[in-house]
Amino acid sequence: MAAEAWRRAVQKQFAAKSFVAFRDLHRNAFREMFERFGLSGDLDACIDEAFDEYLRVRAYPEVASVLQQLEKEVALAIVSNMDTMLLLEALHNNGLSFTFVITSEEEQRYKPAPSIFQRAIRYLGLPAENILHVGDSFEEDVVGASAVGMGSLLIQRSGRSKDPVPKGTKVVRNLGEVRDFVRRSWE
C-alpha cells in the first residue's frame, strides 16, 4: 500500500504543469506521504537518504557488456527523469557512460513529455522511426517515445510491469534481449 501510494505521489509530480527539480519532486512526494499516513520527520534527511540510495544502486550484471556491444553498432543516448548531476554520478558509480545524456532537468519537462524525446532525436540526428527507446515504464517511456514516432521496448525484468501494459507492446526481460531485438531488426 505504501509503495503504491509513493508511486502515485511521484507520478502526480511528474504530471504537474510546471517543472520542479527532481529533489523538489521528492520533497513534495515525501510531504504528501507524511500527510497521508500521519507521519512526521525530517524531510531533508529522507530526501538525502533517497538520493544516497539512487547512488548506491548497481546496474544489472549484463548492462555494461551489452551497452559496450551496442555502442559499436548504434548511437546510444540516455533519456532520464533524474536531475543531470545525480544521473551522471549514478552512471559514473556504475562505470557507465553515454554519448548523449538528456535529462528532465535540462528540458524542464518529465517523460512522457514529447519535448524530452524530441531533444533525443535532435542529439542523435536520426529520423524518429530509426530510434528505439527502451524503458521500464509504459506511461513514461513507451507512450512518450511512441508519441514522437520512435520505436519502443518495455523492459520488465520481473516479468511484471509497474504499469498496465496494453496488448501489442513489445516487452523484453533484460538488455541482452534488447541487443538481440536490435540485431534482428537489421536482418
Report the location of each language-model feature.
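N-terminal helical cap/lid subdomain that shapes the substrate entry/recognition surface
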Residues: 1-61
